[in-house]
Amino acid sequence: MCDEEVAALVVDNGSGMCKAGFAGDDAPRAVFPSIVGRPRHQGVMVGMGQKDSYVGDEAQSKRGILTLKYPIEHGIVTNWDDMEKIWHHTFYNELRVAPEEHPVLLTEAPLNPKANREKMTQIMFETFNTPAMYVAIQAVLSLYASGRTTGIVLDSGDGVTHTVPIYEGYALPHAILRLDLAGRDLTDYLMKILTERGYSFTTTAEREIVRDIKEKLCYVALDFEQEMATAASSSSLEKSYELPDGQVITVGNERFRCPEALFQPSFLGMESAGIHETTYNSIMKCDIDIRKDLYANNVLSGGSTMYPGIADRMQKEITALAPSTMKIKIIAPPERKYSVWIGGSILASLSTFQQMWISKQEYDESGPSIVHRKCF
């Protein structure tokens, strides 16, 4: 019997992108936007096979005629009907597997409400009839992917940013900090500052264009004030971008002003600490004996840590906050966009993990609350 039959499925449901594939693989097979789109207009062409909803890339490509909704906001599922559509799409259209034949490993945001984990568990067993499932915390998986069991993970995706200190494989819940500032907010901010340049982006479809500009052109300045001065005095930092209709726009200091909001949330009118300070605060909430290990293992994870220059800037900012003799190391793996998924793939293929799955039988005996006993 070939082991492909029983390979576990690993599904990392991010606020912006859904990553899915088979345990044991080194990268997800399917990566698509966590979007459900519904037509804004009446269908007039009979027999066109128009659907009442589109998911993922198809929704993205037809975005001009759709209203796009993200069922996961700030890392937490807010619309279960749409979430079910995304899972259905993942299993049947992307991976082309029958979920009732494979154990499924799902991921969740740290500090996820209890009711949410129960609902995920319920849908997996009752709607998709999976034989077994497990819910793992995203940041912990990122740490596994970097080959560590101790460290502090700064996980910043599209919907939420967390700093999660982990010691010997255990997340320390009292020291986890959450910042509701991530990729989507940066996209919105870039929309706003591009508007000041006279380019107007307003619809949900245009927001996706701005997201692309952000991903292709933005970077983090090592010294913000100095970079602003450089941008003001010369055009060396300007880049051009071609919009889908052929119009070319010029982007200047917006390139680093946009991600600067991660370090200075006041740019977005938020009163919270930046990612460097949040990381520091998280470390300071931990036991004094383990701080040294955390400072030396700062792991970056998630798509919003992909900006060029972010690791150097974090190094500089945390060095300024930490005790002067402390050794500080920022680990920024090149595949960190997918490190949660990769960690899930590693975890689900460990032989020692096989007794950790929640089986259908256990679910039938205990109900959805079993998830709190088995997954921690």
Curated annotation (Swiss-Prot):
What InterPro entries does the annotation carry? Actin, Actin/actin-like_CS, Actin_CS, ATPase_NBD
Localization terms from the record:
Cytoplasm, Cytoskeleton
| Source domain of life | Eukaryota
UniProt-recorded Gene Ontology molecular function terms: ATP binding; hydrolase activity
Keywords annotated in UniProt: Acetylation, ATP-binding, Cytoplasm, Cytoskeleton, Hydrolase, Nucleotide-binding
The primary location reported for this protein is cytoplasm
Residues modified to N-acetylaspartate: D3
According to its UniProt record, the EC number is 3.6.4.-
Q: Which SUPFAM superfamilies match?
A: Actin-like ATPase domain
Propeptide residues, chain positions: 1-2
- Name the catalysed reactions: ATP + H2O = ADP + phosphate + H(+)
Chloroplast found in the keyword field = no
Gene Ontology annotations for the cellular component aspect, listed alphabetically: cytoplasm; cytoskeleton
What is the protein's known function? Actins are highly conserved proteins that are involved in various types of cell motility and are ubiquitously expressed in all eukaryotic cells.
Name the protein family: Belongs to the actin family.
Could you identify this protein by its name?
Actin-2
Q: Name its species.
A: Onchocerca volvulus
